[in-house]
Design a protein with these regions (language model features):
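Carbohydrate transferase catalytic cores enriched for Leloir-type hexosyltransferases
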Residues: 1-378
Length: 378
């Protein structure tokens, strides 16, 4: 059996989707042959896991396609890439290569790696599946093009993998996909990496990881943290990810949190250190498809506080402290105080639950269950 993976999911230098794909491919049973329709990529997971030999580094990028800078340079690049198929961007090169591979028919099953309709005119009667990672676009009503593509592909795919039961139920509810057409396969857990255990931050701190836009509910978390430190002023809030936006800076200043909130760009080893030494990890998001940072925190024995939304109870089980939070209303401050008064025994019991919950998540298991989906189709 030969499975063809197309290019889209491997395009970014680093992303959750590319990590998922590389993990399942590297753990795939030996009876599953595969090919990735990809010519150019600087994806770190592909390189670190040595999944493709001799892959080319992208030559034409938004920064260098012309040898000078000007306003809207990246937007012009995007327009050229979209409307001029011969423009030699990695996306155009990889798309054409994927189309050639799909037209050749030299595969038994296509595993489409995102949600884009480009391949439908070329696939003929060959079956395809794809993986649904979340339903953010539909639930928060943005990126209409992606919503449309997901709806079309959900009807035409022979089968769909959902990464959580919650995501499956959203897909069934929103697009009317039959239960039997969707298989839930959870992610595996992260590999524990070696790191210097010396503290990066000397104060006790609450750790926030990842993006902070809209549905991530970060603004409310700032307000909650502000309330908490009125009494417990020794704590900091450490945020990994991008620089604070103007709105975030304004709110941080308004809440007088400038000396209490720290933003950091971190490496994988630094992130492991931050998890390991954190007083707790907080995940206030209103919606996620899976929530991999939960398992990262579990891996480094960090107590976890979760918003009781979407897939979080499914993934974390009873190995977390749950709170209820949405814009302008939250009981997170009370839960932080509750954790503050935990005895050492209670913290150790919580961490033991985390360790046991983490055992459910294994990439070999994820790959095996994915291979079973492939086999059942063919």
């Amino acid at each position: 059996m030969k499975v063809l993976y197309d290019y889209i999911g491997f395009a970014p230098r680093i992303s959750g989707v590319s990590r998922y794909l590389c993990e399942i491919i590297s753990n795939m049973p030996k009876d599953i042959d595969y090919e990735i329709a990809l010519k150019q990529s600087d994806n770190l997971y592909l390189r670190n896991m040595k999944i493709i030999d001799n892959i080319e580094i992208p030559q034409v990028t938004p920064d260098n396609y012309v040898p000078f800078n000007f306003p809207l340079k990246k937007k012009v690049y995007g327009a050229l890439q979209r409307f001029l198929p011969t423009f030699p961007s990695p996306n155009n090169i990889n798309r054409q290569y994927s189309i050639e591979k799909i037209k050749s028919g030299d595969f038994d099953l296509l595993h489409h790696t995102r949600f884009n309709e480009y391949f439908l005119p070329y696939i003929g009667k060959k079956p395809f599946i794809f993986t649904i990672h979340d339903m953010n676009h539909e639930i928060f009503n943005y990126r209409k093009v992606d919503q449309h593509a997901k709806k079309v592909l959900s009807k035409k795919a022979i089968h769909i993998i959902a990464i959580s039961q919650n995501t499956k139920e959203d897909l069934m509810r929103i697009y009317g996909v039959p239960d039997k057409k969707i298989t839930v396969i959870h992610h595996g857990g992260p590999k524990k990496i070696d790191f210097n255990k010396e503290k990066i931050i000397n104060s006790p701190y609450l750790l926030y990881v990842g993006k902070r836009n809209g549905y991530k509910n970060f603004i409310q978390t700032l307000k909650d943290f502000s309330e908490f430190i009125r009494k417990y002023s020794q704590f900091k809030l450490v945020c990994t990810g991008g620089a604070f936006s103007k709105e975030e800076i304004q709110i941080i200043n308004k809440l007088k949190l400038k000396d209490y909130v720290i933003q950091m760009f971190v490496t994988e080893t630094q992130l492991a250190n931050l998890y390991h030494n954190a007083w707790a990890f907080v995940y206030p998001s209103l919606y996620e498809g899976f929530g991999l940072p939960i398992l990262e925190a579990y891996t480094y024995k960090c107590p976890v506080l979760l918003n009781k939304k979407s897939c979080f109870p499914e993934i974390a089980g009873d190995a977390a402290i749950y709170f209820d939070s949405q814009p302008n209303t939250s009981n997170l401050p009370q839960k932080l105080i509750e954790l503050y008064h935990y005895s050492e025994t209670q913290r150790l019991q919580l961490i033991e639950k985390e360790t046991n919950q983490l055992k459910q998540y294994n990439w070999k298991k994820t790959a095996q269950e994915t291979a079973n989906v492939y086999r059942n189709i063919l």
